[in-house]
Amino acid sequence: MRGPGVGSGFSGERGLLEQEAGADTEAVELLPFLVLGARADLQAAAAQHVLALTGAGSGRTLLAGQPELLRALVDLAVAPAPAPSRDASRALVNLAADPNVHWQLLAADPELPARLLRCVLDPQWPWAEEAAAVLANLSREPAPCAALMEKLMAAEPERLGLERLVNALCTPSYNAAAPLHYLGPLLSNLSQQAEVRAFLLDPDRCVVQRLLPLTQYTDSSVRRGGVVGTLRNCCFEHRHHKWLLGAQVDILPFLLLPLAGPEEFSEEEMDQLPVDLQYLSPDKQREPDADIRKMLIEAVMLLTATAPGRKQVRDQGAYLILRELHSWEPEPDVRMACEKLIQVLIGDEPEAGMENLLEVQVPEDVEQQLQELDQQEQQELAQELRGNGAPHT
């Protein structure tokens, strides 16, 4: 005899298939109301419905299988009023936030990056922030990021697109209707690409120098975090460390200042610090975002990869700032990153031939041991978080 569980299972599967078929039909039926030229009130209602669908994973999966609908949505997002561009743009933001939909979006409209870039760089476009957020979401993973970069370079040859993007990022009043904070994460994601880092680190362009003040940008942690992420990625290029730490850029004070608090130092210690880090006000606040603090520490850590870099970081009193940060830091993972950097600064120099930590070849057995130690650290960190009452993840 067939048990009730089996019978209800078949019924449930049939019901689920019927629901999926109905949802597909619903998506197809929406298409005529989304195309350009459709009646305005119906078009607005259809765009709102699609926006609601993108709020759930099942809705995003459904829409990902409808390339014509995705293409119509992009057309609406870049269309002038009275088209419902805002709702269409926000639907694209939600879709692009789902990594499982990235390739479907790019396949539905291969010109999507170029079209959105034009919106982002238009000082009059009211939904430029949403367009920037779509591009930032699409560029989070390496493969879509590379595809996106290829399209951007084709749309704006000779790196003009990157130059204009940086200009918009560094000009808070670029668009009166849109703050463009998401250009920060977009540039950070794009800086995963060697070609972008080469542009940012070109001594003749002075791009990095324009980004440095934004490490203190108080109006948006999104913009600030994106810039810090960009600088951290640039610090992977150890051949540029001498230039970055030298007088032309002088990156270290910009990385350390957000990590500094109101603590007082002795006169002898104060003399070790760069001028910008001396005699800070009693109400000096550290960077409030833990993720950004960690990226700042990681950037300084990368600058210590070479022996000359370690010497410069030591000579500029980084240890003093990190010592006080470690005493204050409430987040265990950030404190751990701080500890590792302090160990590099106060530890002995590596033996001959291993001075560049980014070029050291680690044997497989040692790498496995390091991975096991890292896993052990993560487990201890998780236990500490639970002990402090943090929720389980």
Swiss-Prot record:
Belongs to the HGH1 family. This is Protein HGH1 homolog. It comes from the Eukaryota. The keyword Phosphoprotein applies. The modification Phosphoserine is found at S221. InterPro entries: ARM-like, ARM-type_fold, Hgh1, Protein_HGH1_C, Protein_HGH1_N. The keyword Phosphoprotein applies. Keywords: Phosphoprotein. It holds the Pfam family DUF383. Coiled coil: none annotated. Gene3D superfamilies: Leucine-rich Repeat Variant.
